[in-house]
Amino acid sequence: MYKRQGFFLSLLIGGIILTAVVEVYRGTGTYFWYYAWGIISFFSLFMALFYSRLIVPLFNKQIPLEAGSLRDKIENFARRTGFKLKNIYVIDGSKRSTKANAYFTGFGPEKRVVLYDTLIKELTEEEIVAVLAHEIGHYRKHHTVQFMLASILQTGIMLWLFSLLVNEPALSEALGGERVYFQLGLVAFVLLYTPVSMLIGLFMNAWSRKNEYEADAFAAGQGVAKDLISGLKKISVKALSNLTPHPWYEFVYYSHPSLLKRIAAIERSSSSE
C-alpha cells in the first residue's frame, strides 16, 4: 500500500512540475528554461524545508522523542558541539522495514532530527548519539547545502541544454514527427541526456562518499569513534549490506563507502586525534 501511495504521490508531483514546465514553455518561448529553473528550484527548497512536516506524515507516524536519558544525551552532545537542536522526532519505520536509520532534515527553525524506532530498539544510547554525531558532521561541513546547490545548478544546466535542443527539427523527426513537437523533443532529449546523467551520477556518488568520510572523521574527533563503529555494524546488519562489494560496482553505484572502508577510516581518524 505504501509503495502505491508513494508512486501516485510521485506521479502527481511529477505531473504538476511537468505541466508547469510545458505551460512556461508555451508562455515564454526562448527563455522558458530560466523560468522553469526558478520554479523547480523553489519547489526543491520548499521540499527541503518542509518534507518532514508535510510529506512524511502521509506515510509514517512521527512523535516527539519523549523526555529521558536518550533525549538528554542527544541535546547535551548537540550543545557541546555548538549545534542548535530542538526538534527530535521518532518515526515508526518498523512498520515497513527492519532497517535502522536516522537523519536530519530542514533548515533553520524547521531543522529536525528523525530517529527510526528500529534504531532506538537496536542501538545503545551512546551508539545513537555517535550516529547523530556523524549527521551533525554533515551539517557542520555544509554538505547538505552544497549538495542542494549542486543539484540546483545541475538542473539549470540540464534545462538550458534542453532549451537549445527542443526546437531542433532533427529530434522530432528522429521519433517520427513531421515537424517540431515539444513532447517529441522532450522524449528525445531524455534519451540523449541519459548517458550524461550517468556520468554526473558517478561524480555525485564519489563526492558523496568523500563527504561520508568527512562526517565520520568529524564524529571520531568528538570522541565517539568506538560507538560509531559498533553502531554502523548493527545498522549494516539490519540493512543486509554487502561488506565487500566489487570495487567497480562500489565506484559506480555506492553513495556511501562500504562498511569495512568506513571502519578503517574512522580508526585512522581516531588514532590521529
Where are these regions (language model features)?
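Polar-ligand-bearing catalytic/cofactor-coordination segments
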Residues: 3-180, 199-273
